């Protein structure tokens, strides 16, 4: 019997919470590594590079290599490269986004760029936003890394990409195309990167509106954990349901190969060459 399963998992609320590892996350990831299971950790955070996030996760007790981390910035760079192999963009964002675009072979410029790309930053500049508005009015296409309207900080809630995008839309009339969750484009690009198929992949998340929705729309089985922001009352608010609901990722550490208890990802050896 062969196990044919891959995983996409959200980061905040699933693996870590407020900078601390959620108990059992290390055991789950180690089970995947020990059994050569393909997986990718997803985050709508575009501030940090995968290498930065890998280092931060390590301080929380999770050893996840950069190539196993897929941010909304890397997904955005992947998408843009699929549209224009070597394009030009004016970027409002931090190193996670600029590094991803440079790596994809793009040129960052404010001189008649093809795209304006808006990402997360802790210090939105009025001057940069004004430049973005005028470039869009001049014909640049508008892309955003993710639709989140707020984000957490030590001092409280901060306006995030979605809020600033709304300001730019109000000034230009241009609606952005969002790449990050819940857009299934982010899931598809992550799947392609690890060579996985949606039919054999499980998405683990803590949010109905992003994680479960994007997994559902990408054709994945979904697991919602209660260790983040969602509870049973939150689940009932939506017209769709996850495949399975668990308390935390620790519940999957010992059943990673059969998360729903139905043997759906077990393939008889004689069939693995005929699919």
Curated annotation (Swiss-Prot):
Keyword terms, alphabetized: Carbohydrate metabolism, Hydrolase, Magnesium, Metal-binding
Entry EC number(s): 3.1.3.-
One Gene Ontology CC term in the entry: cytoplasm
Cofactors, names only: Mg(2+)
Phenotype of gene-disrupted mutants: Inactivation of hdpA leads to a drastic decrease in DHA production from each of glucose, fructose, and sucrose. No dihydroxyacetone phosphatase activity is detected in the deletion mutant strain.
Keyword Metal-binding: yes
Positions of the record's site feature: Orients Asp-12 for proton transfer during catalytic turnover: 56
Subunit and partners: Homohexamer.
Protein name, as recorded: Dihydroxyacetone phosphatase
Organism: Corynebacterium glutamicum (strain R)
